[in-house]
Amino acid sequence: MVANGHFAGSADGQHSSSYEHGVQVIDEDKEFNPNVSKYLTYENVTPAGFNYHLISVFGSQSTGKSTLLNNLFGTHFSVMSETERRQTTKGIWLSKNKRLELRKDRDPQAKMADNILVMDVEGTDGRERGEDQDFERKSALFALATSEVLIVNIWEHQVGLYQGANMGLLKTVFEVNLELFLKDNKSTPRSLLFFVIRDFLGTTPLQNLQNTLLQDLNRIWSSLSKPAGLENSTINDYFDFAFAGLPHKNFQPDKFMDEVQKLSTRFREGHRDPNSLDRKGTGSIEGGIFLPEYHRRIPADGFAVYAEGVWDQIVNNKDLDLPTQQELLAQFRCDEISREALVAFDEAISPFELKQAEAVQAGYPEVLGGLGPAMRNARMKAVKNFDTEACRYHKRVYQMKKAELQDKIDTRLKALFLGQLGAAHRSGVQEFSESVSAAVKAGQKKGASYDFAEIVRKQRKLAIEKFEQEARSTLVEDAPWSNYQQELSLYQKDLERTSGQLRRDEMRRLATRVERWVRSRLGESVDLEFNALGSGRGGSGAPEFGDKPSEKTIWDRVWTLFVDTVLDAERRFTERASSFDASLDEVDVGLWRLRRKSWGVLRAKIDEEMMEGNLLLKLRENFEDKFRYDDAGVPRIWRPTDDIESVYSQARESTLTLIPLLARFKLAETNAPPPLDKWIGHTPSSATPADEEDLTPIGGVDDDEGKSLEEEMTLIGEAKKQDITVRFKKTADGVYVEAKRSAIGGITQVPLYFYGLLFALGWNEILAVLRNPVYFLLLFVCAIGAYITYQLNLWGPIIKMTEAASHQAVEEGKRRLREFLEASDTGRQAMAMSGARNATEEHEMSRLSRKPAERGGRKNRADEDVDDDDDDF
């Protein structure tokens, strides 16, 4: 787009060369140019912050405003052709001061201020707009809202005129200024009206012209309808005035340029003379014309947005509220700066967030290395970048947006921080558990000399130190969430829970080792007691030394052995548990579980001994000890004269008394079951469901079991007792019959006549042997050999050797016969037929010859492996 003979720069994507002559801020159609910010960036004004100044020029059309600016600031605004009298500047144009490049050799004290922006405003009273003064009013309001200095370009001969001296325009400026001040009642921003009197001849002193203009301005101000509260205000409350005169450009060109050069030195920072200050703080200006109070306090990087917002309010005929516009600008720019700061923050923090999220999703939170420094640096840089750019804007908005930015940053950093502590928490607890377990195993290998409580305390201290170190390395200074005491407290509680669980597990393992020890001791002791049944009569099971145990007190002895063994186990358990730093409640629960488990071991052992096969075997052994041996333990040799029936009846009845005795666990001393319920005790109040889930219910102890103590102590039911009694009697009857047969067998004798007959018939053979020395000697040698063989118990081996030799001879004969038959066809056919028939017969015979399974013997009991940890038991 081309305007005023130059590129307006309103089209998107303009090249930087398009901005060499400035940029059209507002075109003749009242449209704001969105590329103003690009122009400021091109001129390197954006980073200047508050170090810039904005000047606007007013005046009638075709009065040389653009010419003045071009000569004064080195700009390239379009000027009117000398051959035509028409509008040249359309809308509002903006350009940066270029005079600095032309004045490098000037005095540094008199050089112009940096970053001076000049706005060339469309002239007033032009024929193109005619009586349409809407744009004049809007452009005046826009210039007043944005500019520090308003240059009024008038001719000397127009001073004293109303229209010619732009008094109508100035009245508009004053009116809109009052509107602005009415909205902004918290401050009173001032502006400088700089009157540049063109074609100044010097005939009328400049001071007189100045007085005339000030009189006209005061008169206009007095005629204004002022809002409430400003009735007594004066023009000097809001404006400062400066005046300068310039010779005719065409008639006095050299002098014109000299005066322009002098005028340019006034466009620099100045200050008020402290000696001339009045009660309102105003006074004469020294140095340059740019005072801090003129500046609108809009940072350079936000000027384009601010100007666009102001113009939007003006062009839409809305009340222009500069404080609101400044706040809106501050919000807009602070949001932009915040987003830019968050971009750099994202680049630094997003990789850590991604890693943490992946680790959490995988179920294995990971402690991220270098997270703390990255968080601190990212937060510091983001806040610093925001402060650098945003601190120039509205203070309240800046502080609010800074707080919002910090909230966003801290929300993400807090999530990372908590995630890091969560990962450190989980890994720390896991490492603590593994370290304790490893130390316990190492102690067990050294001979069970480890102190579990000391191991836990040491590893717990190391775990807490590591957690605190990780937490401190992740802290972010000045962050409200940067405190890990709550997480540390949770971590310590979790370590306590883990320690308690490890202690309970270790006590469970200790209880298991003690139970194995109890099982081993009870197994041996109970075996000895049941094996001693019947030894009271001095049979084969009688002890070699000491008193012979009574069968009636077997349960008393078993109970005493059981109680003593468990008491010893409890003592060992308590001593070892004290090294675990276990509480009294935990020890009570452990002892209670040990007693219940031990009773289960004893009951299982008794049930094993009371199995039908084992019990019948014990009854038979008991009966045979009483029947086959006398009271002195000497085996009986039955004779026909012995009273076998009486001995049999006594032994059988004595053995039958064992069945009811063994059927019920009852103490002979009290004739009642042992006090199992009192011995085990009540369930400890600290016991948990987990402590009871693996325990076998005990009748008379557990109310919900539904069995009484009497039923718990019943080992053999009535039906089983009757069956065992019948079967035992049959076994005893068999022993009795065998004894009876052996006694009767000794009564049979050879008749006497048989010896006479044998002597008569064998007389010739007797004489032959006696008369022949060889036969006699052979008979004598055979007799001696037979005697020696008998004395040496060699008849058995000789008979076996003979049988083996005969068997081998028979097998060898069969083999040779088979080879002979296989050599002929007839023999092979006969063998095949014989084999088929024999297979059938063997199958039938195998079914008939199957032996029934032997009655259940004593169950093999495998020796239980005892761990190295059981050595102390």
UniProtKB/Swiss-Prot annotation:
Residues 771-773 are lumenal. Residues 1-20, 677-703, 828-873 are annotated as: Disordered. It is a multi-pass membrane protein. Its EC number is 3.6.5.-. SUPFAM superfamilies: P-loop containing nucleoside triphosphate hydrolases. PANTHER family: PROTEIN SEY1. Cooperates with the reticulon proteins and tubule-shaping DP1 family proteins to generate and maintain the structure of the tubular endoplasmic reticulum network. Has GTPase activity, which is required for its function in ER organization. HAMAP family: Sey1. This is Protein SEY1. The lineage of its organism: Eukaryota, Fungi, Dikarya, Ascomycota, Pezizomycotina.
